[in-house]
């Protein structure tokens, strides 16, 4: 009997050493938080935060690390998270286009290799699963330039995401500042078994994603303001898909324009265009825009990017930190992940980087009050 109790205690101590627990109180007499990226809601005062140190990322003032504070509450139908992470700059410049004498050029640094680290929006991601994983390792990722023996290598040379078996539910939320994120949009992606590559992917001409499955609705809600190019293709002039109806108003909406990647963007600036603010490219309209003009590289294709979503959020940056508030339904069907006690979470910070994100080993185990 004593030996059995000692064994249970040892297992519990071992698990506690390998994971953090986020206690999520139930809202009974307090209203659910308003999703606005601001902190004063009474609901958040009920939630005890945990701090998750993340590292091995890109930029972030040259440090490559960011501490992420997580709080959460639930009301029996929805769970509400508040993520606050360190980021010295508000980065909204997402692959902007600048007009030169020979035409329009996409500002980038390795975007053709899926490894943009300069002209990219800030992002944040959270992975959730109900698998009892305490060290993600081979369950979600293979590293190196050729991570999977019978599949193409990665253009970035830094590995692929996947699942270790078919039918495993792994859901990845991704908030993207200029691709609908500041309008309430959060992508809901998934990891699965590695997909079969296309001929172009096998030849190393275009990106191979392994088992990463992007949100199927994303392409109808936002996109780049230029056609995708193969490796090396962004070094030549590329016409925008759309030009601003009023280029001066669009330029003014960018705020103070500083094309130094490590310089943050001003509050209220918008580095994206909507359909209502733009028209399909034409040489006549192009001729009215002077050399030196800068236009957004991100297009918002839908009036409300967060429409009919079962996950939504709002974010705000200030004093070197982003705060993102997220609401997600608790129930879900495969391939989504129902959220409950023992759901595990990992988070990642992207500072104006496409794929070069921070990471951490110990999962956050969720524990919901009944």
Which ranges hold each PLM region?
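Beta-strand elements of well-folded, non-transmembrane domains
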Residues: 74-76, 85-89, 319, 330-332, ...
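Mature N-terminal segment immediately following signal peptide/propeptide cleavage
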Residues: 23-56, 66-71
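Acidic/polar low-complexity flexible segments
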Residues: 13-38, 97-288, 292, 318, ...
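Hydrophobic membrane-insertion alpha-helices, especially the h-region
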Residues: 1-13
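N-terminal onset of structured domains
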Residues: 64-72, 77-79, 90, 333, ...
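Beta-strand-rich interaction surfaces with strong enrichment in secreted/lumenal proteins
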Residues: 58, 68-71, 311-317
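Acidic, glycine-rich flexible loop segments
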Residues: 296-335
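Short, well-ordered beta-strand segments enriched in hydrophobic/aromatic residues
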Residues: 37, 78-85, 322-328
């Amino acid at each position: 009997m004593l030996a059995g109790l000692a064994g249970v205690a040892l297992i519990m101590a071992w698990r506690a050493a390998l994971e953090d627990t986020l206690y999520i109180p139930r809202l009974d007499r307090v209203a659910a938080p308003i999703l606005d990226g601001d902190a004063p809601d009474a609901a958040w005062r009920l939630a005890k935060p945990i701090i998750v140190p993340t590292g091995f990322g890109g930029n972030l003032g040259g440090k490559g690390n960011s501490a992420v504070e997580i709080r959460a509450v639930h009301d029996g139908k929805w769970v509400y998270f508040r993520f606050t992470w360190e980021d010295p700059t508000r980065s909204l410049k997402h692959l902007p286009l600048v007009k030169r004498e020979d035409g329009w050029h996409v500002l980038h640094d390795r975007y053709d290799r899926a490894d943009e680290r300069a002209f990219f929006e800030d992002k944040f991601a959270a992975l959730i699963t109900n698998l009892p994983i305490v060290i993600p390792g081979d369950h979600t990722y293979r590293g190196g330039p050729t991570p999977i023996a019978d599949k193409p290598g990665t253009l970035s040379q830094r590995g692929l995401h996947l699942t270790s078996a078919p039918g495993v539910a792994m859901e990845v939320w991704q908030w993207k500042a200029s691709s609908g994120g500041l309008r309430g949009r959060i992508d809901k992606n998934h990891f699965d078994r590695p997909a079969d590559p296309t001929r172009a992917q096998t030849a190393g001409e275009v990106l191979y994603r392994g088992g990463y499955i992007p949100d199927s609705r994303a392409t109808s809600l936002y996109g780049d303001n230029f056609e995708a190019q193969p490796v090396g293709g962004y070094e030549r002039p590329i016409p925008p898909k759309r030009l601003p109806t009023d280029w001066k108003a669009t330029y003014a909406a960018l705020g103070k324009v500083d094309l130094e990647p490590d310089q943050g963007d001003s509050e209220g600036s918008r580095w994206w265009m909507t359909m209502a603010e733009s028209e399909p490219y034409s040489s006549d309209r192009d001729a009215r825009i002077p050399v030196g003009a800068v236009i957004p590289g991100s297009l918002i294709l839908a009036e409300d990017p967060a429409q009919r979503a079962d996950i939504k959020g709002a974010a705000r940056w200030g004093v070197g930190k982003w705060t993102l508030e997220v609401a997600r339904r608790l129930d879900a069907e495969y391939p989504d992940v129902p959220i409950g006690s023992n759901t595990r979470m990992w988070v990642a910070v992207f500072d104006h980087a496409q794929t070069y994100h921070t990471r951490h080993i110990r999962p956050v185990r969720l524990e919901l009050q009944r």
